[in-house]
Curated annotation (Swiss-Prot):
Record lineage: Eukaryota, Rhodophyta, Bangiophyceae, Cyanidiales, Cyanidiaceae
Natural source organism: Cyanidioschyzon merolae (strain NIES-3377 / 10D)
Family: Belongs to the cytochrome c family. PsbV subfamily.
Membrane topology summary: Peripheral membrane protein
UniProt subcellular location: Plastid, Chloroplast thylakoid membrane
Name the UniProt record assigns to this protein: Photosystem II extrinsic protein V
Amino acid sequence: MIRVIMLLVLVWMTPMISWATEVVKDVSGQKVEVNADQLKRGKRLFNTHCSACHVGGITKTNPNIGLDLESLSLATPARNNLDALVDYMKNPTTYDGSESIAQIHPSIASSDIFPKMRDLSEDDLYAIASHILTQAQIQAEKWGGGKIYY
């Protein structure tokens, strides 16, 4: 009887699970809902294009600066919202915002040097940014926290 009830609950919840959304913010602080398909796409793209250096939200080249919300919010300009992260993926700058690092960080601006970036559309960049911000919310300090968590 319990198995039947559990099965019925699972069947009943399946449509709700597929419509699940996460909430991230845009540059004005407005909440933006991101659906499960967008998050799945963002995760796939992140794993393909970003995880060589940012697995688990860390930054292998500078472990002091991760993709956690605190680090993103302390950057200049702040990178803790969708639009700012997309802007960074197009034209990356140093953490203090003073210099372009497009020649050493994969970006749309340097797609001639980093061919993996050539095929990314604006929607792809937003999907990746959604994945990063969602992971930062869900995993909290584990996302970008470095090897103390892995």
